[in-house]
Amino acid sequence: MSVRFIIGRSGSGKTTMCLKEMIDQLAQKPDGDPIIYLVPEQMTFQSEYALMNGSLKGMIRAQVFSFTRLAWRILQETGGMSRHHLTQTGVHMLLRKIVEQQKEQLTLFRKAADKRGFIEQLEQMLTEYKRYCVTPATLKQTEEQLRRHATANETVLADKLKDTAMIFEQFEQQMAHHYVDSEDYLRLLAEKIRHSSYMKRARIYMDGFYEFTPQEYMVIEQLFIHCPHVTVALTLDAPYEQLPDDLHVFRNTWRTYAQLRDIALQNGVPIEKVEQLRHNVRHKHEELRHLEAHYDDRPVCKWEKQTEAIIIGEATTRRAEIEGIAREIIRLVRDEGYRYRDIALLIRNVGDYRNVLKTVFADYRIPYFIDEKEPMLDHPFIEWLRASMEAVRTNFRYEAVFRAVKTDFFFHLDQPVHDMRMAMDQLENYVLAFGIQGDKWTEHWTYRKYKGLEGVHAPQTDEEKRYEQQLNEWRKLVISPLLVLQKRLKQAKTGREQCEALYAYAEHLQIPQKLERLRDEAEERGDLSVARHHEQVWQAFIDLLDQYVEILGDETLSLETFLTIIETGFESLQFSLVPPATDQVLIAHFDRSRLSNIRCTFLVGVNEGVIPMRKNDDGMLSETDRELLYHYSLHVAPASRERMLDEPFLLYLALVSSSERLYVTYALSNEQEKTLLPSMFIKRLTDMFPNVTKMQWGTDPFLLPLQQQLAYVTNDVATLGPLVQQLEAWKRQYAIEPMWWDVYNAYVQHEQWKERIAVVVRALFYENRAKRLNKQLAKELYGKKVKASISRMETFNRCPFAHFAAHGLKLKERTVFQLKAPDMGQLFHQALKVIADRLRQEQLPWSQLSKQQCEQLSYEAVEQIAPYIQQEVLLSTHRYRYMKKKLQTIMTKATTVLSEHAKRSGFVPIGVELGFGDGEPLPPLTFTLSDGTVLQFVGRIDRVDQAMSEQGVLLRVIDYKSKQKTLDLTEVYYGLALQMLAYLDIVLEYAEKLVGTSAFPAGVLYFPIHNPMMKVNEWLDEHELEKKFLEQFKMGGYVLADEKTVRLMDEHVEPGTSSLIIPVRLNKNGTFAQHSKVLTEQQFTMLRQHVRRFIVDVGEQMIEGVTHIAPYKQKNKTACQYCEFRDVCQFDEGVDAEQYRVLTPKNIDEWLKG
């Protein structure tokens, strides 16, 4: 037995030497003693490939092992495999069970235990303990020592050790004699090597390692003692006798070398002469050899010659960075004879790049393999299971149920997916509108179109009955299997029965067959990676259930605990890594990569804080914790400060990993447009290579030299974007290279591509303008007899397209089960009608109501109407019931103020919710348009009041609003506020029908129904408080400029005072103050005529098919601010600013003077 060390810098041929020796031995004696090539886990596949890629046609002696795989092999020979193996998923579930049972005993982690990711961190902590040979007893002993020194840091650390020791001890007790996890294998391997005849004959080659854990050192010690010969290859520049400086690039591998030598010497194992390889045999270019040799020199050793093998790439964004890399890969493969397998990307923050890598490499059709396991959590099958469990847990809340629905796994195999998705959208609309959850899922649903509070008692139509039946069929499709799952889970007595319930649920819905179909579809698309995911996920689910049954199958746990443990298992599931092809770009993690035979490396994302790594969280143990533990002689993994010293070595390995070309790239901003800075290493690299080649990615291609523009021409998908940029530049009068017209012609002449380029060209010259409808189509949309509301005309004047979307296309927002402002408005209006009707029935005037009566009437009115508002939303939850009380309070205040108005006013209500239209008290306001189309206006007026004066009957219109509002005559001029004056016009037009005689205009007023906060800065008596309260409810609008009419409206107004009811102030001489809102009878007539002209004009535009996207803009107000159709019209204020209809200020006084 002996130990030999092969050392040398990276690229000196250590791996090649090991492989050559093994191949020579196999060639000389194919059936000789075993040869074991021991490498890190991530290096096993490529090592097997390298071993078989030589002159050998096969082998029996040699095998490639990682430590774990070697443990399995030896335990199969010597015994120890009888215990059940727990995967990481099984370990997580067991830990979750222990945590749930011990939660009340936890000191520090009690609250954190419920947070996502806690079990993963806990498992990492216990793994670290095992790897560093730390036991629960050790933790308890250290905890006791810490308690004797009760500083704040030491107390917190002691609590951490107490909690983890308790969990660790429970975990070890559960594992003892029954189970084994991945970390136990190394301990068992160290124990069993002495009993293995296989190992006693084996020659060992260890390669690719830079450091080892204490557990691994235990195994290596046994290898040294019992194996005939062990060769260890290490990346080290010299066999130092003493520890180099802490900042030395090879400090880590020297420590490893020194510890391995000590183990050999302590066990009396002979150490052969160190084989030191001194020549760089990897790198083909001088600048790469210079970089390898002088990477860490201080001061910088410059390379003054032109540098072509090292390229620095700067990109505006991460996407631009990956697109630039993709173009370079295509160029290298197309023009320089590279294979995809010759190229590797090294990335530290893979998570930041994963999605953009997948998207861009798919567009460029670059085959790739990401050497990092993906979680299964986002797979639709796992999402369906998790959402189903959440639905059971939350009693079928909307969010959980539709998370499950949107995975498509509820659909039958013979149901078209597209049609069923449309059906589920309709089901979701109903669920959102009616607030379906809990027991409502099990009830028969009824369906009736909501026609307002007036139509709640209308009979159900045949169409509504058919839709109701369809809705209930869809409801049963979703809820029936969930109800069966819920029932079986609740009836289950043991963990086994709970798992059987989950399995039966999946089997009942034919999940295996559906996953097979998804796999086949992925294979047909050529997406082999996704196809393998669909293959793996079902087996992973079965394995998870098996693990649960093995660990907890006979235990009785609550449904909540079971679901929590299973959820923890799902969170730990990962897809296994099987490279789907041999010729593909390798995307590897910067820290863990082991590359071989790579011609070109892209070192990606070299930004500040990434490379070198910023000091980060050390998991459950902080950096201070780790230093304290080291002080108390308890050794765990190094703190981040210690790991920072290894950064130069990791960067060195990445920089020298390729033989021919090195790209170092970084981005200047991330996806959120946050600025990113280049790593300080970029400056060091430019200092070392002053003439390094630099590339910039993300600028418009037409700004680049022709040679660089050629790189943008790759394939039909990826080239389309740059071509569009070129055509846009040409459209803006920039000159573009003739090459791009060749590319354009290639698209046009290609049968499969010409339609795609036609769409692009149309988009290039697209203007966001809605076309005018032809007259016939407009007539079909709106009809020969158009029934409309006044507010519809206002909508047209705000933006014709909004009118077209609402009344032509009949688009509307999805109804959601919640109380919105329009619902509250409906309630207020209807409640006041109910109160007014009751007062009329009881012949009780408003002026005689007491405060108590106002309160009682308001309470009863809201109680009566609440069940009809938004599917009983006000009765659905405690929050909404509280809101109903608040609405009753608001109604009480409004009713009280209306009563006070009645006491002060000579006007009395003669109509509440007064309808006009066919079958209503008043006929519709009717106009005949130029083509014979009849325009009828229908609606309801909130309130009409009457008073008698010397000149005759006076009529005023009152509209209820949820806040104080005034009438802006500029908006009247531009047709944005027609309603109030149109209502006044209607009641005056049909006055004889309403009051039996002609009438005169008294005013148009807005009454606020709100809950104002009164601000007072001094003590006020009751009278003053009442005045202050009334002021908060002062009506806005305009009244007739007649003192007698004003006194009829507010009998308490005196010269020199302001009215508390209407927007008027009288001067001492009885004239109206400047800011009083008054209009003469002539001005009212003029405004009525203006409104009529505007209405006819809008009607004419409607039948002409006007649908322009032309929102108004008035100072800071635009039609787009609260428009529900913005996503439909896609009006872009930045691009389409010229399409605003700017409303210029109007001198209203001049206009009204005529």
Swiss-Prot record:
GO terms for biological process: double-strand break repair via homologous recombination. Residues 1-284 form the UvrD-like helicase ATP-binding domain. Residues 279-583 form the UvrD-like helicase C-terminal domain. Binds 1 [4Fe-4S] cluster. Its EC number is 3.1.-.-. Despite having conserved helicase domains, this subunit does not have helicase activity. Heterodimer of AddA and AddB. This is ATP-dependent helicase/deoxyribonuclease subunit B. The gene is addB.
